[in-house]
């Protein structure tokens, strides 16, 4: 009898406290709980890890060495486990060749469609090129009215310069009598002299006929002869009518442009047969940008106007100085002339070189002064050459700071060679199809009319493409295009794309584990996602969804609530059952919010701001429709709108990149816009995202917030440390001296197991304490440095209550809801939400200038409603300090607490990019046509009740 439940016994991974849980199979199961409660530890690090490990174990040891080996999770046993597929948010491809089309494999089917039924056209004149047999040509000619006089001719030259003496002589020897040169018939016995500098059209007259059925055989022979003379091209001159051009190959009869046999690889931008030769199929390339090389044109060369690596020191006898002095002397300026006042030809010489013209360079050293003549290649050309030649990633990154991305001038961003782009299906080429939104692409396929032969060939291909496009639309991604780069997708979008791909595979009996699939999805599209999840369940799969979204919880068959708190306060199963059961569970924080017993309140009154604002004029990046947007300062501002409406384009691509360049001195190229007014009201911009605070276990909340420096100073000031002569660096695990050298301060040692997963074991010498014995002998209030790092923030607050400097920083960590996190917890073990809150606490602990703008993109990702409550309080504290906070968000609990909302839409993709509503939440809720307003209105009404 098949197992009805997945049974987990004794799960102890991370903070899980010997958890036992039964999960029904073939159901939609939601794992919920506070951020850091242990949901992901149970779902991904225990259940998925064991499912994956068991599958890998079934392979041979030879095959296993090529796969990422998975350590056995800390669990007694798991029963009823199916093969597991994880769809998380961390595997977004950053490969510039990866697109929505390639990730979903729709583009593979599309290439096959164009290769099988595509109609090639001449890249020069756009004429349709079709391959015809001799019989096809004969049938076509005999369709002319009977009695029509025709000449069968072989074009041996079309628009070519030359005298063609050999060709004409050869035709005469072969017995041909007439030739037509530039439209005039000549007898080959005549002397024909051509101007070799002019382009000529030459056709040999092979036969002259009168159309009637009896000439079929003779016509076929003449056609074969003519095409043999002219590489498969034939011209039939209809006397007193139009000429007809035919080709036996895929070649333009007029221009002779030949197209090879259509194959799927011709339409792949990852294959040299299809990729544009200029950009190698990338659609863009890096090019030196004069505006990034000289960002501040008010500076002179001596003041360091040039920021390019190797050219940023025009003083002190450097090579750069010698070249700049040579150019200055030649073009009539000095090294002290502001860059904006340098003559245009001087600027051109600095950027693009002297075009072979030599400069006089003077070299001064201790032996005297010498001069020599040399040409200058120009800074732009120098950067371009070094970029191509270097093999160092560091050098490439350094040079890229002075380069911007430009669209390929040959393929104009289409990635393919021109011959491939001249093949159409339904009147459009493959790039035009890939640039249609998914909704428009489905409409195009529905209206596509094909011949019976094409229908027979393409029926299955079109069905596969349409099914996959429909799956993408069903998960709320109808606004995306197949040409969209994977690197530009949000984590939620890329996760839903992989979800749609899984639906397309139609596997059954699989355990799917998903990580917040609703992230980045507007409430309007939530029902589509839920239907997709239900469909996956209904065909016979088990779904475990780690989720905080209330709609998803209500739609679930079963909920597992992990908690009750986070970190050391979590790791238990609070309750399990239906949404109703969770709501009735008094211990469940989730149940309290789900039932409405707890709510995030709406502020009693909205802030009016400081009267200043940022005005973005003419925003037209991606799908933005040349809009003007005003964002008030000194307020909590939410940017809302359905997925793909243009929120990230407006804030991340235009506003943030412009602000970070002007205020922070970064080298970013802002998205297309006319101007931004009001930047002088700010002094810095900070983007707080969910990226890790560090990539190694050496990074932790203490090192990131800077409190570790204060703690080390405190230990160095103890009597014992002073007696031993220990300074603060003695208490660092990153440098030699105080750390344990056996593990170099890591506390753990890696043991390579080759065919098995590598094992990390506590260091034999320090037993995981990271420091040597002498360092650990120094104590403050009975605790050594290791004991302090092992304390939670909550414990640390009490321990350091008499040290204001340390207490203040720990207090802000506690205030953002991280009281349960260890002071020295490795950054690699923090969730995205936790990392974000560490960053927020660091900002809160800084002295406020009141002129900072904070930008956050979906900060509620991974956060439980209780965590969202804390996050909102922190963000409002930043605004209370006089700063401005701009948040891109779909979470209505955050949106309802905003002072000001800017709602974009009305739809996603091409149908978005406009401002639909702006104002307070109450004003937006009253705006017809705003999807955000519709859901906000309901929530505001519920809250008032």
What are these regions (language model features)?
Residues 1-945:
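Conserved phosphate-binding elements of NTP-dependent enzyme cores
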């Amino acid at each position: 009898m098949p197992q009805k439940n997945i049974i987990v016994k004794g799960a102890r991974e991370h903070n899980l406290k010997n958890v036992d849980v039964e999960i029904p199979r073939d159901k939609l199961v939601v794992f919920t709980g506070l951020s850091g409660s242990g949901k992901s530890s149970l779902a991904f690090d225990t259940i998925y890890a064991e499912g994956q490990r068991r599958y890998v174990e079934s392979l041979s040891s030879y095959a296993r060495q090529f796969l990422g080996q998975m350590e056995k999770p800390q669990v007694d046993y798991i029963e009823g486990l199916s093969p597991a597929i994880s769809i998380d948010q961390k595997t977004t491809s950053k490969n510039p060749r990866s697109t929505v089309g390639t990730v979903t494999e729709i583009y593979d089917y599309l290439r096959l469609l164009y290769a099988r039924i595509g109609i090639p056209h001449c890249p020069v004149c756009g004429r349709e090129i079709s391959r015809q047999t001799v019989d096809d040509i004969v049938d076509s000619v005999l369709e002319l009215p009977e009695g029509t006089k025709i000449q069968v001719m072989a074009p041996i030259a079309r628009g070519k310069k030359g005298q063609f003496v050999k060709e004409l002589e050869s035709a005469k020897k072969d017995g041909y009598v007439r030739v037509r040169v530039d439209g005039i018939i000549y007898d080959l016995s005549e002397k024909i002299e051509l101007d070799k500098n002019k382009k000529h059209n030459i056709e040999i007259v092979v036969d002259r006929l009168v159309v009637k059925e009896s000439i079929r055989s003779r016509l076929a022979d003449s056609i074969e002869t003519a095409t043999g003379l002219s590489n498969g091209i034939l011209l039939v001159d209809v006397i007193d009518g139009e000429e007809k051009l035919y080709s036996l190959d895929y070649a333009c009869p007029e221009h002779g442009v030949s197209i090879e046999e259509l194959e799927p690889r011709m339409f792949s931008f990852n294959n040299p047969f299809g990729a544009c030769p200029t950009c190698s199929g990338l659609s863009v390339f890096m090019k030196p940008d004069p505006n990034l090389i000289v960002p501040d044109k008010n500076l002179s060369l001596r003041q360091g106007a040039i920021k390019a690596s190797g050219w940023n020191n025009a003083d002190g006898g450097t090579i750069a100085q010698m070249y700049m002095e040579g150019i200055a002397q030649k073009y009539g300026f000095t090294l002290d002339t502001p860059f904006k006042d340098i003559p245009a030809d001087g600027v051109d010489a600095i950027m693009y070189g002297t075009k072979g013209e030599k400069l006089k360079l003077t070299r001064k050293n201790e032996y005297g002064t010498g001069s020599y003549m040399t040409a200058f290649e120009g800074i732009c050309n120098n950067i371009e050459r070094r970029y191509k030649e270097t093999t160092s990633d560091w050098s490439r990154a350094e040079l890229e700071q002075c380069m911007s991305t430009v669209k390929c001038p040959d393929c104009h961003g289409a990635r393919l060679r021109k011959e491939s782009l001249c093949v159409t299906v339904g009147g459009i080429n493959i790039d035009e199809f890939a640039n249609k939104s998914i909704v428009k692409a489905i409409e195009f396929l529905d209206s596509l009319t094909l011949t019976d032969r094409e229908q027979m060939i393409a029926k299955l291909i079109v069905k596969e493409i349409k099914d996959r496009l429909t799956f993408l639309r069903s998960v709320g991604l109808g606004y995306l295009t197949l040409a969209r780069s994977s690197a530009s997708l949000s984590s939620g979008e890329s996760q839903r794309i992989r979800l749609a791909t899984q639906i397309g595979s139609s596997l059954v009996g699989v355990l799917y584990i998903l990580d917040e699939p609703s992230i980045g999805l507007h409430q309007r599209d939530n029902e589509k996602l839920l239907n997709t999840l239900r469909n996956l369940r209904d065909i016979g799969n088990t779904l475990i969804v780690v989720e905080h979204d209330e709609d998803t919880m209500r739609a679930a068959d079963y909920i597992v609530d992990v908690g009750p708190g986070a970190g050391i306060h979590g790791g238990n199963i609070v309750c399990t059952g239906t949404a109703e059961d969770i709501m009735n569970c008094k211990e469940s924080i989730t149940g309290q919010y789900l039932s409405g017993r707890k709510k995030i309140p709406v502020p009693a009154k909205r802030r009016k701001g400081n009267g200043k604002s940022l005005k973005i004029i003419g925003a037209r990046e991606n799908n933005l429709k040349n809009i003007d947007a005003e964002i008030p300062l000194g307020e909590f501002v939410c940017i809302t709108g359905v997925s793909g409406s243009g929120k990230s384009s407006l804030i991340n691509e235009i506003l943030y990149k412009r602000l970070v360049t002007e205020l922070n001195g970064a080298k970013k190229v802002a998205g297309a816009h006319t101007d931004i007014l009001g930047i002088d009201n700010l002094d810095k911009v900070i983007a707080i995202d969910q990226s890790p605070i560090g990539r190694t276990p050496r990074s932790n909340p203490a090192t990131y917030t800077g409190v570790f420096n204060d703690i080390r100073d405190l230990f160095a000031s103890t009597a014992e440390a002073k007696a031993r002569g220990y300074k603060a660096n003695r208490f660092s695990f990153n440098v030699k001296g105080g750390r344990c050298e056996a593990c170099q301060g890591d506390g753990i040692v890696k043991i390579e197991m080759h065919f098995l997963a590598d094992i990390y074991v506590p260091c034999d010498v320090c037993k995981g304490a990271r420091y040597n014995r002498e360092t650990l002998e120094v104590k403050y209030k009975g605790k050594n440095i290791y004991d302090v790092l092992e304390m939670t923030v909550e414990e640390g607050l009490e321990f350091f209550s008499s040290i204001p400097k340390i207490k203040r920083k720990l207090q802000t960590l506690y205030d953002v809801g991280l009281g349960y996190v260890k002071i020295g917890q490795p950054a690699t073990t923090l969730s995205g939400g936790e990392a974000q809150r560490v960053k927020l606490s660091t900002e809160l602990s800084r002295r406020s200038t009141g002129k900072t703008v904070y930008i956050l993109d979906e900060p509620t990702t991974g956060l439980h409603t209780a965590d969202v409550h804390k996050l909102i309080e922190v963000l409002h504290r930043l605004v209370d300090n006089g700063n401005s906070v701009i948040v891109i968000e779909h979470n209505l609990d955050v949106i309802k607490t905003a002072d000001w909302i800017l709602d974009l839409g009305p739809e996603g993709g091409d149908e978005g990019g406009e401002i639909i509503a702006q104002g307070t939440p109450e004003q937006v809720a009253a705006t017809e046509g705003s999807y955000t307003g519709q859901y906000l209105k309901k929530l505001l009404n519920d809250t008032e009740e």
